[in-house]
Amino acid sequence: MTNLNEQYEEKVRPCIDLIDSLRSLGVEKDLALPAIAVIGDQSSGKSSVLEALSGVALPRGSGIVTRCPLELKMKRKNDGEGWQGKISYQDHEEEIQDPADVEKKIEEAQIQIAGVGVGISENMISLEIASPDVPDLTLIDLPGITRVAVHGQPVNIGEQIKKLIHKFITKQETICLVVHACNVDLATTEALQMAQEEDPEGERTLGILTKPDLVDKGTEQMVIDILQNEVIHLKKGYMIVRCRGQQEIMQKVSLAEAIEREKAFFADHAHFCSLYDDGQATVPRLAEKLTLELVHHIEKSLPRLEEQIEEKLEQAQAELVRYGTGPPSDAAERLYFLIDKVTAFTQDTISLAAGEELRCGEKLNIFSALRREFDKWSIHLSHTGQKFNARIDKEVAIYEDKYRGRELPGFINYKTFEVMVKEQIKQLEEPAVKKLRDIADAVRKLFLQLAQCSFTGFPNLVKTAKAKIETIKLERESTAESMLRTQFKMEMIVYSQDRTYSNSLSDRKKEESEEEERRKGPKLHKERNCMDNHATLQELMLHLKSYYNIASQRLADQVPMVIRYQMLQESAVQLQRQMMQMMQDKENMEFLLKEDLNIGCKRATLQSRIKRLMKARAYLMEF
């Protein structure tokens, strides 16, 4: 470790301190930070590895001993300096004077967070250790993976633990440190399987083999094959360590002495000595590798971390703008605050009706929806006209028999023409009214959405605006329906300017003639039309189609104009007028400005988030 500290003194500690500082700010609530998460099946030797790295005893025993994520922050001090410890969780922070007290303090913290028993919690405990005997390193210890619930444990304890582990190791910023006992088949290790699920390429997974002294004679080569990456490939590779066994703990073998025993074990081992020579064995070498891996991972993650902080900060600031600053306490200022709120809303309703950008920031556009609806109306008129033309061919002879009077053949019966035109146009009235109701409902929803956005956090203002929007919608819809029905009553007067009608009739005759020529030729057409009364009927059909074309064009414009004028322009103006009149009642001000209790909490949360993100940005800029 001396060589490591000399080589990376200016690099290692600042990198790790930076991430620790960001984590202590609570930035991990907002984005993922580079970390090393330690996972392993129960009895894999995970606690022993952490004890060897930290130099302090951690909770151990049968069953689940790690019941909360434990952030283990180790800081190397100069030789001769004293040991320091600190534990913090929730709102509690406590200095630890004696390394022997660490285990007890962690157990107390777990009881406070996860309760008495064997339940687990996602809330983290932070343990900080400063000593000349520890590496510059931060690890997150996670509960050991269990398969079967024992007495007192929830039936789904295994699923709870896996869910907690996945929450940490799914982040690309997390290095997975998988602890595995040498005397257990690697393929059955659940911790490694979970790491492979989240990191299938093995790019951010490091394997740690423990308990090499328990390997059966003759199977040493299998362990070496794993360490040489020939069994399950991990890009970060494998390390092997020998920590204190249960017997050594009972014999009170110190951690320092255990390190010396470990060194002798590997150096003198017939099969594992090569691993020691290659730097793949012992806790000190593991500490060195982990430190370098973490520093490299931090440096690699910093550019993306800066981007994430800027993104999250921008999002939080934009969200805070939506919630606003809250109403002031001074009565006069409260009135001005209300006026500003209502004015901004009413101006946005006018802007919405005009298709302009809104001050509230919402991307609401009614005209794209209106355009689609009015296009549908135009298509409906066209389709109805096509059906009318097809029906004319079948029914015109019937109408001729029914309504023809004393006229000689060749004279068009105007009454027949009028009856058929009126009947066809009358069929368009209800579809026009339905189109009005559909659009009225769409406009109402957008106005309600605008009110919700403009008066976020003020439920009484929202309710008042909604009530007015509903009332105005009914009034304007009734007026618009009356105008549409009047329009259709006027359409019962068969009328068009002579020039307009003559042009339409001429165009229709030209189209019919061209169509007939394409089908049978002009000579045959003329001969057939002169044979009998068919010529009269053909003439009547031309008149019917010509007039419907004029009337449908008139309705294609008039119906949308009525709807748009009443449901948009007039509704917006009336809403603006009524909202302004509402503010004349000064006694109503306090009722309208009563804020939603949750909004104050959300605003405080956002302000806190912005504060810590700005601090985090400052830390990164200074780094």
Curated annotation (Swiss-Prot):
Residues 30-303 form the Dynamin-type G domain. One of its GO terms (cellular component) is presynapse. Residues 65-67 are annotated as: G2 motif. It is found in: Cytoplasm. One of its GO terms (biological process) is defense response to virus. The keyword Cytoplasm applies. Residues 141-144 are annotated as: G3 motif. Its main location: cytoplasm. Keywords: Cytoplasm, GTP-binding, Nucleotide-binding. Residues 40-47 are annotated as: G1 motif. Residues 537-623 form the GED domain. Residues 242-245 are annotated as: G5 motif. Residues 210-213 are annotated as: G4 motif. GTP binds at residues 40-47, 141-145, 210-213. Residues 506-519 have a biased composition (Basic and acidic residues). Signal peptide: none annotated. Belongs to the TRAFAC class dynamin-like GTPase superfamily. Dynamin/Fzo/YdjA family. This is Interferon-induced GTP-binding protein Mx. The gene is mx.
